[in-house]
Amino acid sequence: MKNKLKKFFKYFTFLFLLSLIILYGYNNIELYVNKISISSNGNNVNTDILKTQIKEKIKLQNFFNVNPVNIQKELINHPWIKKIEVYKKFPDKLILKITERVAIAIFNDVSLVDESGNIFKKLKKKKNLLKFYADDQKEVKYIYDFYKKFIKFQNLNNIQIDISYIKINSIKEFEVRTKANNLIYFGSKNIDERLGRFIQLYRSIELENLNNVEYFDMRYTNGVSVKKRR
């Protein structure tokens, strides 16, 4: 029994010392990151600037001491980065794979809204995007959910209605303006039913007649009010 314990202790000591030697060697080998590869599904992240920032951050670090998790945590704060993977490839390469946010709308003419309904960046350049309007940015989620339903109903009925803006007021009533300059009042109740009713009505009206419609008021229980342009 004692011999077995001695053998085990010797074996354990050997492995421990070997590990220390390997770690010491890794930390003292002059091996650094010389290549940084960045791929992205969009073009809103400036990869050249990103490479410069990363090089500055890790320039004095041994390849084995570079921590991909720390780089990932730092870069995820970039407004356009939705997801990022960072990993090393021996002997001297750092690889980054970026998934960018997709801007689908502009909130109150000042901020961008992404494909998940999140406000993520101040608008700097004019963009031809759908507009969301509300008194409070907390209402963006309600507008986004309404927008997704509107698109779903269009897809189910094989129809396309180009939207200029969606607005919600303080009592959560929805108002939509199309790019054909039709205004639609949906109110705040029975949204699914009213959307379905509107889609059926819209597809039954010929294009030239749509151009003569000022607004559709869907806030009726069984019908709709249509006002023509003068």
Q: Language-model segments: which ranges?
A:
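Flexible glycine-/small-residue-rich
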Residues: S40-G42, I98-V102, A134-D136, T178-A180, ...
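Extracytoplasmic segments of membrane-associated envelope/inner-membrane machinery
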Residues: L94-S170, V176-R177, L183
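Hydrophobic membrane-insertion alpha-helices, especially the h-region
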Residues: F9-N27
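Extracytoplasmic/secreted envelope proteins and their assembly/folding machinery
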Residues: T47, K51, K55, P68, ...
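Extracytoplasmic/luminal low-complexity segments enriched in Pro/Gly and acidic/polar residues
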Residues: K189-R230
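Terminal hydrophobic membrane-targeting helix
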Residues: N27-K126
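N-terminal positive-inside, membrane-proximal cytosolic segments immediately preceding the first
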Residues: M1-K6
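Short secondary-structure junctions
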Residues: I29, I76-K82, K152-D162, E206-N211
